[in-house]
Amino acid sequence: MRLKFLGTRGDVEESSRKHKYHSSLLVTHKGFKLLIDHGLISIPLRKIKPDAIIVTHAHPDHFTWLKKDEEYKGKIYVTRETKRASKFKKNFEVINIDKWFKVGPFKILGYRVIHSLIAPAIGFKIKGNKTFIYNPDLIVMKRKSVLKGIDLYIGDGSTVTANLVRRKDSKLFGHTRIQTQVNWCKKYGIKEAIFTHFGKEPIRWGDKKLEKKFKQEEVNVKIAHDNMTMTL
């Protein structure tokens, strides 16, 4: 599998040369191009030419069709909530939560994560020749057992030290820290982790400072940047 981070920026005003576009990942396997998320500030789909798109949730930095139409005739796999939130009619396929489904050569599991009150989110466990997790926006997974048997964890880089967990009544929303996710990797024996979807604090820190902060032996932590590619 070939992974290309088309964008690595969250829904923040801050940006940099390395973090310009909203977080999006292109996964290519056996000639099939799977795009994960496509926000308002993204490379045009006519240039990416994905065979299918899967979407984590209906926030504008992940789902352009909340505010702006973009022509695409392929299938877009979304939750029921995301489909309802779309202002434009597209070729949507509804994801059944906690049930595996097939897209091209990939087996995919969409599972609930706690992140937003108005746009319920999911993460993805994706199997090709290897298995990886994609959690660009979350506080916590509702079922951490999805972390078992993972070759790579791709997670939420919104915050390093700032507490971005908020509460309304008894419900939580927001983002967890990078270190919390690294600790999950340690617990489940995941040796490789990459962070994307950077917020204000991490963008101001810069990639070199982030890499130094999280350099360790148990988990090989990498900081993704726009146009970064890797083979899994």
Question: Where do the model's predicted regions map?
Answer:
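Active-site regions of enzymes building and remodeling cell-envelope glycoconjugates
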Residues: 50-54, 71-76, 88-98, 107-108, ...
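Active-site environment of divalent metal-dependent phosphoester hydrolases
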Residues: 59-63, 83-85, 101, 116-118, ...
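Cap/insert and terminal regions of metallo-dependent hydrolase folds
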Residues: 141-228
